[in-house]
Amino acid sequence: MAKKSKIVKDQKQRELVLKYSKLRLELKKKADYAGLSQIPAKASPVRLKNRDSIDGRPRGYIRKFGISRINFRQLAHQGKLPGVRKTSW
């Protein structure tokens, strides 16, 4: 599990990206790069790091579910992920 501070930092950064998303889009359409430079750099969605929504793990992230491979496996075995079935071949 990641440190609580990392999880909180990630949540705050995601809120910041949402807050400035409309403004960034408008400034990009106008090609107002001077205005874009006035927005905080952390408000750019490119700077987001994918982290597990449950425990904040930064590696082994599965985008479709928003969780790490470890939590994916646990939840899949418990049957808590709809549409996920164990396969064998």
From Swiss-Prot:
Keywords: Ribonucleoprotein, Ribosomal protein, RNA-binding, rRNA-binding
GO aspect biological process, one term: translation
Quaternary assembly: Part of the 30S ribosomal subunit. Contacts proteins S3 and S10.
Function: Binds 16S rRNA, required for the assembly of 30S particles and may also be responsible for determining the conformation of the 16S rRNA at the A site.
Family per record: Belongs to the universal ribosomal protein uS14 family.
HAMAP family: Ribosomal_uS14_1
Cellular component, GO annotation: cytoplasm; small ribosomal subunit
NCBIfam families assigned to the protein according to its UniProt record, in alphabetical order: PRK08881.1
Listed name of the protein: Small ribosomal subunit protein uS14
GO function terms (MF aspect): rRNA binding; structural constituent of ribosome
One Pfam family from the record: Ribosomal_S14
Classification via InterPro entries: Ribosomal_uS14, Ribosomal_uS14_bac/plastid, Ribosomal_uS14_sf
SUPFAM superfamilies for this protein: Glucocorticoid receptor-like (DNA-binding domain) (SSF57716)
